[in-house]
Amino acid sequence: MIATGHGGAERRTTAGDGTARPVVARTIGELRAARAALTGPVAFVPTMGALHDGHRSLLRIARHHGDHVVVSIFVNPLQFGPAEDFDRYPRTLDADLAMCAAEGVDLVFVPPAAEMYPSEPQVRVSAGPLGERFEGSVRPGHFDGVLTVVAKLFQLVQPDVAVFGRKDAQQLALVRRMVADLNLPVQIIAAPTFREPDGLAASSRNRYLTDADRAQARALPTALTTAAAVAAAGGPPSEMIEMARKVLADAAVTLDYVAVVDEATFDEIDDAEWSQRGEGLCIAAIRVGGTRLIDNMPMRKAD
């Protein structure tokens, strides 16, 4: 059962099976009132909903880093381009709240778009040059939208730590850069990529895949694993990329990009630089059917 508390937020209650349900706040006022009642360190997991086992792993990591866990569920219109999947992005609020309850989340913020953006925002966070390459070049303005909503959520939730998945590596790098550049008092925790049994990185968009699409999509983690084997054997980035491209071409997927980069700056690492450093991140984006997927894997030269 969920009861209404002060300010209209649905307060924390216990279901018939003994599971404690989180407070659900739908307005900024409700969020602030519920947040004020939390004492001790707060860990925050921002999401767009359609929660899956990858999100579950984030919630469990958050629990280790705070006395309280706060989750936001908000499909942010600012980070979608005009031809992207905002309208069809999966929305599964009941299931999302059930997962939050099962994982002991204390507070869930579920604002409508009009609550976050009552008018067209005139001031936004710019992702700068880092936000213009790779994902940013394919999705112009995407990272400005991501950083704007994350900055707003940090301001509203006031977390001590926030947990982001490594699957969205460029987003993680940009959030870290924003926190450093704007002196935001939030520690960013990077969570390992959660992989499904067939190796595909968990993603809300995986549910778009048909069985045939999924069989093709498995080439993405295979390509990255192949590149990692090249790195471990002493091969340079050019060979890693060549071998990854071959795996993806054999699977007949559409390749947006594959590159070996520095995980903090997303500068590409060439063969000469690799010989000095011996580590980096192989990133790739593909399209299968009507679905776009991204993934990455660390590359390390054998000792």
Curated annotation (Swiss-Prot):
Region of interest: Disordered: 1-21
Active-site residues, as the UniProt record annotates them: 55
UniProt keyword list: ATP-binding, Cytoplasm, Ligase, Nucleotide-binding, Pantothenate biosynthesis
Pfam families to which the protein is assigned, alphabetical: Pantoate_ligase
One Gene Ontology CC term in the entry: cytosol
Gene Ontology MF terms: ATP binding; pantoate-beta-alanine ligase activity
Catalytic activity line of the entry: (R)-pantoate + beta-alanine + ATP = (R)-pantothenate + AMP + diphosphate + H(+)
Subcellular location: Cytoplasm
Record's keyword annotation contains tRNA processing: no
Protein role: Catalyzes the condensation of pantoate with beta-alanine in an ATP-dependent reaction via a pantoyl-adenylate intermediate.
Subunit and interaction comment: Homodimer.
PANTHER family: CYTIDYLATE KINASE/PANTOATE-BETA-ALANINE LIGASE (PTHR21299), PANTOATE--BETA-ALANINE LIGASE (PTHR21299:SF1)
Family stated for the protein in its record: Belongs to the pantothenate synthetase family.
Official protein name in the record: Pantothenate synthetase
Source organism: Acidothermus cellulolyticus (strain ATCC 43068 / DSM 8971 / 11B)
